[in-house]
Amino acid sequence: MEKFMAEFGQGYVQTPFLSESNSVRYKISIAGSCPLSTAGPSYVKFQDNPVGSQTFSAGLHLRVFDPSTGALVDSKSYAFSTSNDTTSAAFVSFMNSLTNNRIVAILTSGKVNFPPEVVSWLRTAGTSAFPSDSILSRFDVSYAAFYTSSKRAIALEHVKLSNRKSTDDYQTILDVVFDSLEDVGATGFPRGTYESVEQFMSAVGGTNDEIARLPTSAAISKLSDYNLIPGDVLYLKAQLYADADLLALGTTNISIRFYNASNGYISSTQAEFTGQAGSWELKEDYVVVPENAVGFTIYAQRTAQAGQGGMRNLSFSEVSRNGGISKPAEFGVNGIRVNYICESASPPDIMVLPTQASSKTGKVFGQEFREV
């Protein structure tokens, strides 16, 4: 059967999907609904074709996929009451018993009640969009999400609220494209682990080289306070600054350091400012939480007692895998692998698809690409 893959126009390439996770093999599409929605009903599709029963009664529905083949392996439907009962307990038990290699599509259809233990499970799974109890009591919810059992976490979600009076498009459409389970959540999970938009500057000259210690001022912060455990992968990002006087003798340094239960140092990952004096330079890296780690700190400092250094816009979030690129750029039926997008381009080419050996595999230019 014919399927649109890409359109080449004057100065642009149009594809169905620009895959930030560098994946194009499988695509699951879902949509949730609620009463008074003017859009279509709930659905579940694989490779843009309906998969499994498309008849959804009022309630919360689960579709379980094997990510290695894309096969639908299980289906569940739950019509909850407003309070905890055997149905809500069955939902929690089923979700907690899943093997660690499943993708679960979660979607609503029609009027859905959400008893406390179901809401509690969603909170534990890392939802950031699901409404509070006070909103649930006044609005109907259209909800769609993808849950990855390997991380026991919601990887993507979409929610809309109906005031129970007005008709509107309440359909919550959500797509995920992946090659393997590790691709789901590769750009981060809804629960942002930590973010600071503050700007921190060191003293000018003097002997105090500290710029900032985060996420708290304590020498060691608990990993558990940020839902992190050994083996988790973090995407760490910050902007660093150094003036000319500092660069004449040193630079600005940032490190994330890990500690064991006895507060003993285990390991660290560091980055240094290498840009032009007086400018801000973005630094980003993937960091694996080491074995036996229970605490950590992020520390920014000058490496010389001269001039001024700075740090701003620090954030770190859990992702499903590190950022190593193991697959060459390519077109697939679900779009194009793209690892990162530049805002502008200087080459005359419509696009560049480097080889797997290239350090810039998957690089495309944002001004030349658009999604359908």
UniProtKB/Swiss-Prot annotation:
Broad class of the protein's primary localization: virion
Keyword Heme (UniProt): no
Superkingdom, taxonomy of origin: Viruses
Keyword vocabulary terms for this entry: Host-virus interaction, Late protein, Lectin, Viral attachment to host adhesion receptor, Viral attachment to host cell, Viral tail fiber protein, Viral tail protein, Virion, Virus entry into host cell
InterPro entries hit by this protein: ILEI/PANDER_dom
Example GO molecular function: carbohydrate binding
GG-type lectin domain sequence ranges: 22-193
UniProt-listed GO biological process terms: adhesion receptor-mediated virion attachment to host cell; symbiont entry into host cell
GO cellular component: virus tail, fiber
Pfam families for this protein: ILEI
Compartments, record wording: Virion
Subunit structure: The long-tail fibers are trimeric, with a stoichiometry of gp34/gp37/gp36/gp35 of 3:3:3:1.
Main function: Structural component of the distal-half of the long-tail fiber. The long-tail fiber of T4 is about 1600 Angstroms long with a kink in the middle that divides the fiber into proximal and distal halves. The latter hinge is probably composed of gp35 protein.
Protein name: Long-tail fiber protein gp35
Lineage start: Viruses, Duplodnaviria, Heunggongvirae, Uroviricota, Caudoviricetes
